[in-house]
């Protein structure tokens, strides 16, 4: 019995350590994106992440085997969780789909204002691939985007069509964008904040492509 208790304790500690390292890596990735002003998108190398986090590249790949896809999804999940806490709601397990979707959309919109660069990069991946890459149909980023979307649907067991999900997401996030613009005159720091964020680039690029083509 004591042996089993010791084993359980070790397993719990091991899981806690792994969870702490995982969050450290996500926060480090967000910092890289923010410090870079979103210029490179969610395009982070294991070496970059290792340098800023102090975690070995071997450990990084154990957390994110498919680095860009897994890291993008983890950042998205982190920002959504952050937003859910911001809205003071519980986990979405028992929610109706309509309410669940509403929180996902609001969460992504909130992420874009809380972390202008990291949030908009994840949104950019969802909508158009790498928003700072002129080749929006770049195969790698289309795959990343589609993997993220598929994971959202799998995790949350959504019945809505992917096209409708993307269309609604666009309406929510663009609404947040317009709210940010409308508040510029009311806040002397507003214009400065808007100009240094990547909102304008996201909005500009989203108008150039078929947002809802997720084939």
Predicted regions and their residues:
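Hydrophobic alpha-helical connector segments
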Residues: 88-114
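Amphipathic alpha-helical packing segments from all-alpha helical-bundle domains
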Residues: 84-88, 130-157, 163-170, 193, ...
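Hydrophobic/aromatic-rich alpha-helical bundle segments in the mid-to-C-terminal region
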Residues: 123, 154-202, 206-215
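Short, hydrophobic secondary-structure boundary micro-motifs
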Residues: 41-43, 118-124, 214
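Short, basic, alpha-helical segments at the C-terminal edge of helix-turn-helix-like DNA-binding modules
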Residues: 46, 76-84
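Helix-turn-helix
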Residues: 24, 32, 39-70, 74
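Basic, helix-initiating cap at the start of DNA-binding domains
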Residues: 1-40, 48
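Amphipathic alpha-helical segments used for helix-helix packing
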Residues: 112-132, 178-182
């Amino acid at each position: 019995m004591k042996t089993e208790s010791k084993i359980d304790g070790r397993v719990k500690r091991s899981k806690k350590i792994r969870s702490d390292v995982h969050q450290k890596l996500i926060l480090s990735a967000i910092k890289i994106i923010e410090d870079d002003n979103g210029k490179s998108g969610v395009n982070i190398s294991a070496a970059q992440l290792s340098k800023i986090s102090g975690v070995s590249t071997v450990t990084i790949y154990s957390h994110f085997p498919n680095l860009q896809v897994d890291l993008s999804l983890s950042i998205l999940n982190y920002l959504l969780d952050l937003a859910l806490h911001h809205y003071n709601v519980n986990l979405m397990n028992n929610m109706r789909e309509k309410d669940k979707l509403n929180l996902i959309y609001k969460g992504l919109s909130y992420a874009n204002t809380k972390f202008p660069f990291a949030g908009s990069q994840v949104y950019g991946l969802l909508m158009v691939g790498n928003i700072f890459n002129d080749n929006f149909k770049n195969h790698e980023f289309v795959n990343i985007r589609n993997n993220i979307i598929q994971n959202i649907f799998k995790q949350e067991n959504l019945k809505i069509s992917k096209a409708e999900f993307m269309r609604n997401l666009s309406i929510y996030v663009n609404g947040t964008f317009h709210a940010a613009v409308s508040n510029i005159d009311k806040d002397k720091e507003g214009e400065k904040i808007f100009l240094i964020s990547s909102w304008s680039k996201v909005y500009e690029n989203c108008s150039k492509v078929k947002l809802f083509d997720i084939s």
